[in-house]
Amino acid sequence: MDYHILKKYRYTNRNQFESIYSSRYKNELALHYDFEIHGFPCFSLPTTEILNLTSRIYKLTQTLIYLKSKLPQIALEQYTQTCLIDEVKLTNEIEGVNSTRREIQDILNTQSITQKNIRLYGLVQKYNLLKNSEKISIHNCSDIRNIYNELVSEEIKNNDPLNLPDGIFFRRKSVSVYSPHMKEIHRGISGETEIIACMEKALFILHNKSIPPLIRISVFHYLFGYIHPFYDGNGRTNRFISSYLLSKELEPLISYHLAKTIKQNISKYYKSFDYTNDTDNRGDLTGFITNFLEIILASIEALIDSLEDKIERLHYFEQILLSNFKDKTDYGILHLLLQNSLFGLEPLSARKMAEMLDKSYVTINNRLKKDSIKTLLRSDIPHKYDLDLDILKTL
């Protein structure tokens, strides 16, 4: 039986609305949270759908880990970086902040901060930490503010300094979220004292180990959005925290696909916030948890589909290379270019190839001039190379 949001019963079954709410809230399996939405204590139910989603998420995470193990190291590094770049670009895009793949790639390549890249540097570096399984403290309001500072404060300062937090940790004044037609759809918690109190409750829920991990992560994602602790940057900070938590609970690669899946389902994502915020929903978080778990599952499924396709193509082209190139250095160069063509974002220079293959630049440059190799190269950018897979197919 489908689990309908409470608000729906207010209009379709008014006579039973109170009894349906009461039966849900008092259900012996209900999880109760020390947090109120419009005066109603929050709760959720472990529906069959939530249990199935959770089970499938953990099962497919193991499939994803297995597929990662089938990739050559260079292919895995290139694929991870490609996903990271797309995640940063899309988490900005959701908020209407422009950033290009080239800007993000340059920060990852140079690892240095400049006046030109300062607005994105912190965001990129923070996401880059996820692939290395580094620990980030998310235990108190100071931690939340530190994450915000490192992620988005420079970009917000450059764009509109008045949108920077004016309290100890968070904003002091009120803030609202508006629809494209300028209708107020949500008003964040008012006053920094109350914001701090609510955030501390949300963090307690996040670290309450009596609650299943994916439920905690989903609930915290909602509560952060409901509290809306900053004037600007709430969405990016919230998504990063969820990405970090998922990287720890599941697999780091999943953390680089959350914004993409949210953007693909943006209407459903915002709608789940809207109806959970509604007074008639009476603090029932079950629907939001279900939708957020669906987003996590869709992220994993998309990664699996992508990797399965790329691994199949990799094996196909590897056989062509093995049949046609017996020289180890020639094969090594072409195999590297094959991995980059399938899994990377930008072509490789001879110097980069020399570094990756531990060969001299002269050796790589001379081999690239060989007719048997040169005919397979595509060079859309001067002195940078990819394999032309259409030509490789004909061998």
Where are these regions (language model features)?
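Short amphipathic alpha-helical segments and their helix-coil junctions
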Residues: 60-71, 125-131, 200-206, 268-277, ...
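C-terminal regulatory or interaction extensions
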Residues: 221-229, 239-395
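Phosphate/pyrophosphate-binding active-site loops
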Residues: 2-49, 181-306
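Active-site core of Fic-domain adenylyltransferases
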Residues: 81-83, 89-231, 239, 243-256
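N-terminal structured helix/loop subdomain that forms the ligand-binding/catalytic interface
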Residues: 1-157
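A generic short alpha-helical patch detector that favors 3-5-residue windows
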Residues: 56, 76, 80, 96, ...
